[in-house]
From Swiss-Prot:
Protein's GO biological process: asexual sporulation; sporulation resulting in formation of a cellular spore
Keywords of the record: Sporulation
Gene: sspN
Residue numbers spanned by region Disordered: 1-47
Biased composition (Polar residues): 29-47
Matching Pfam families: SspN (PF08177)
Source superkingdom: Bacteria
Coarse class of the protein's main subcellular location: other
InterPro entries tied to this protein: SASP_SspN
Any one cellular-component term (Gene Ontology): endospore-forming forespore
Name of this protein: Small, acid-soluble spore protein N
Signal peptide: none
Upregulating conditions: Expressed only in the forespore compartment of sporulating cells.
Subcellular localization, as worded in the UniProt entry: Spore core
Length: 47
């Protein structure tokens, strides 16, 4: 039997721009596509 916790769209192509990203509980959805801007790097240790 399959694991019911895994969503069926886990195996869908996840390239930036192929799927609409909605802001939800998962912060990763917000961090993926920022419409052409550079990735925001947050340094946690050292400098």
């Amino acid at each position: 039997m399959s694991n019911p916790k895994r969503s069926p769209n886990h195996f869908a192509p996840n390239h930036i721009g192929t799927q609409p990203r909605a802001a939800g509980g998962n912060k990763g959805k917000q961090m993926q596509d920022q419409s052409g801007q550079h990735a925001q790097v947050i340094q946690t240790k050292g400098e």
